[in-house]
Amino acid sequence: AKRFGRRISWRTVCQQVNFTDHCELDRALRTSIGGLRPDLADSAARDRLKSYCAQHGVFPPNEGRFEPLMQSGLATIFRCAGFQSLIVGDEFGDDERLVPVSLLERNELWDHMAELPKFGVKRLIAPDRSLLAWVHWDSFYTLILGTDDAFRDLKVNSLFEGFWCSDETETYWLTQNCIPLVQ
């Protein structure tokens, strides 16, 4: 997938599946893994998404991981921010390692690299703590956090699709008013 996969935007998926917005898509994805209470789940949306993916050869993402098609973009962010190395960590901080950014730029899947945490890379941290990429264990989003200085020259919008969080944005943002995707 990392070498031969083709990116498809969430915006495109929403249009094709007839979802109102990315919040509805998130609800369908999280319903597919049994990650929502029954009052929040949407099995009809889950089924529409599953059908669309099957018909169009789309591999839906797995929860709680940096997707293969995002991995090079994540490495690029740290490289463009001026870092030659970064800290990679597992979910709980039990296994953190300082690795060269070039290791993450390889065409190999991070899950199969012996130099990286045994139970998967869930966090990427700049050595000076000015930039962090984190994936929530039971969700389908990647959060990229940074200082104003760290983000100043980064063109995150050109690498990823998403929205800018505010101080009020919660981990379970699908229950909040929908934040528009950045154009």
Label for each model-derived stretch:
Residues 64, 68, 109, 113, ...:
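Alpha-helical context
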Residues 1-112:
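Extended, low-hydrophobicity segments enriched in charged/polar residues
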Residues 1-2, 8, 15-18, 23, ...:
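Low-complexity, charged, repeat-rich alpha-helical/coil interaction segments
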Residues 133-183:
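Alpha-helical oligomerization segments
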Residues 88-150:
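Amphipathic protein-protein interaction modules
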